[in-house]
């Protein structure tokens, strides 16, 4: 495990490829989604993956922690003409939700650990029914899912837009002094 030896920076957005090219990463535009490329960087190797969690063009850059600040500075300088700005976890979280990327234990919990008594979240409730392969003749829950597909789901994961003051992240919302589900 080399986690404590590496630093990672995520560069996301429509100009991310142009920024990396300006930084000197030649042929970065040839990277396909989920590709990993390696580039020389101050006598070390910079690993770049064409990945991200925002639903936009994006890359993740990996370097030893000793060169992390230097990488940040060069990345920031290369992106200055593009209006590069640092962003945090909340912005990433909003972008991934807008892109429809859901996370286990954040947006839903697995059936065995669900917080609602006697309520297992199904793929149809989460908008993931298209992932269920009913061509497969036998799997646990197949009959229940076929029934739900035919009759519809009782619950559905929805996006809620709130204008004005927003509730805190992971806040419980109340209606008539009762916790909403």
What are these regions (language model features)?
Residues 1-181:
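Conserved, structured C-terminal
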């Amino acid at each position: 495990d080399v986690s404590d030896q590496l630093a990672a920076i995520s560069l996301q957005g429509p100009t991310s490829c142009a920024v990396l090219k300006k930084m000197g990463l030649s042929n970065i535009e040839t990277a396909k989604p989920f590709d990993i490329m390696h580039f020389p960087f101050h006598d070390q190797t910079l690993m770049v993956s064409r990945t991200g969690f925002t639903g936009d063009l994006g890359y993740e850059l990996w370097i030893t922690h000793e060169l992390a600040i230097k990488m940040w500075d060069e990345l920031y300088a290369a992106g200055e003409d593009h209006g590069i700005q640092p962003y945090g976890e909340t912005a990433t979280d909003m972008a991934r939700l807008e892109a429809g990327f859901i996370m286990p234990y954040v947006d839903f919990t697995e059936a065995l650990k669900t917080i609602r008594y006697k309520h297992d979240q199904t793929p149809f409730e989460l908008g993931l029914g298209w992932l269920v392969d009913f061509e497969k003749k036998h799997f646990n829950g197949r009959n229940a899912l076929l029934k739900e597909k035919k009759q519809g789901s009782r619950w559905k994961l929805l996006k809620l837009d709130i204008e004005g003051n927003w509730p805190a992240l992971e806040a419980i919302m109340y209606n008539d002094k009762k916790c909403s589900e």
